[in-house]
């Protein structure tokens, strides 16, 4: 499924991004390229110690923020599949910094969609949360909005060969 494909994970140094990286490298050892896209230089450095390019020649580390559309477009060059895992996910931090949460979780989603539509990406999976079902806080509301944007992108793609999907998870342990 992913062998000989180029995959990019936004939020690739986060808890879900790291686990996805482990899974992809284990199950699909012939992945053409796996791009870890995140804004945290220190986490990228640490992840590169765990997954060095010398042992994992397909892996690439790309500094960038989902709020920066032009940087996303550059990162998506030559990518087949995008897994969107970047988000502000801590409920109390989102409540204290609502503008940043909206910019990242909604604006970032819009930018990922725009960058995918302007490139040759064929599959997009946005990671969401159970908090998006009947949201009671800002985090849940922004993720519900993000989910709706990704699903609606299937209606604006025209004849472009791209599929947008959303998956929701519960609380992740471990």
Feature locations, PLM:
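Conserved Rossmann-fold NAD(P)-dependent oxidoreductase catalytic core, especially the SDR/UDP-sugar
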Residues: 81-84, 88-148, 152-154, 162-165
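Adenine-nucleotide cofactor-binding loop residues
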Residues: 42, 67, 89
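Conserved glycine-rich Rossmann-like NAD(P)H-binding loop of the short-chain dehydrogenase/reductase
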Residues: 29-43
């Amino acid at each position: 499924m992913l062998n000989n494909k180029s995959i990019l994970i936004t939020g690739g140094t986060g808890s879900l991004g790291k686990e996805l990286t482990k899974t992809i490298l284990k199950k699909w050892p012939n992945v053409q390229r796996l791009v870890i896209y995140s804004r945290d230089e220190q986490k990228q450095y640490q992840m590169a110690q765990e997954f060095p390019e010398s042992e994992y020649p397909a892996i690439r580390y790309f500094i960038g923020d989902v709020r920066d559309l032009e940087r996303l477009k550059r990162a998506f060059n030559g990518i087949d599949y995008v897994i969107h895992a970047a988000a502000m996910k801590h409920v109390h931090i989102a409540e204290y910094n609502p503008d940043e949460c909206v910019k990242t979780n909604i604006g970032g989603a819009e930018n990922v969609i725009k960058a995918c539509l302007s490139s040759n990406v064929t599959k997009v999976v946005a990671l969401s949360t159970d908090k998006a079902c009947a949201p009671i806080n800002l985090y849940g509301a922004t993720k519900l909005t993000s989910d709706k944007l990704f699903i609606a992108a299937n209606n604006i793609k025209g004849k472009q060969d791209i599929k947008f999907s959303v998956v929701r998870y519960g609380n992740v342990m471990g």
